[in-house]
A protein has these predicted regions:
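Nucleotidyltransferase catalytic core that binds NTPs
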Residues: 1-181
């Protein structure tokens, strides 16, 4: 396992992977990993040559600053869980300043009102925050496949729309929900 904290490190590794014509799988997370995340990682390992997990608590997804402040973070535990899946998973866990400038600007996307219903109805601008960070990750990793859980139905529809808006060649792999035993 390699742990990366800088985009420049990731870019070097990704370019090498692309030159070798290997498939890249991406499993974006905000950490605090559980069985659902681990099942996504297993699926990625089964279907891609190189797998990246991201552990990044994205501030632009939070309307309430206390929720952001109180979001559980335990990188040591997360890394131990990832190692149980495979020693060959790369992990990117940047600081906020590595992903955003000081203003934490989000892009505004036309999600065709998908972001205005269900969870989006109560979390203003949440899905623009999701779209912004996923867009940054897709541009950094250039993944062939990105793995998301079907539990996040609205989010998977948003990501699918984002792929169309940005014309990414990434395949969205929606995996069955796995719960803690």
């Amino acid at each position: 396992m390699q742990l990366y904290t800088l985009k420049s490190q990731v870019e070097t590794s990704v370019q090498k992977t692309i030159r070798l014509e290997k498939t890249i799988g991406l499993v974006p997370t905000m950490g605090s990993l559980h069985q659902g995340h681990l099942s996504l990682l297993k699926r990625a390992v089964e279907s891609c040559d190189i797998v990246w997990a991201t552990i990044f608590v994205n501030p632009t997804q939070f309307n309430n600053k206390n929720d952001l402040k109180n979001y559980p973070k335990n990188i040591k535990n997360d890394l131990e869980l990832i190692l149980k899946i495979s020693k060959n998973i790369n992990v990117f866990s940047p600081e906020i300043s590595e992903m955003y400038d000081s203003e934490l600007k989000t892009e505004t996307f036309d999600f065709q009102n998908l972001d205005k219903e269900l969870e989006g109805k109560y979390r203003n601008n949440h899905f623009n925050g999701v779209g912004t960070i996923v867009s940054k990750l897709f541009e950094l990793f250039k993944p062939n496949k990105a793995f998301f859980g079907e539990k996040d139905f609205q989010q998977t529809r948003i990501i699918n729309r984002l792929i169309k808006i940005k014309n990414y060649s990434t395949e969205l792999v929606i995996c069955p929900t796995v719960r803690e035993q």
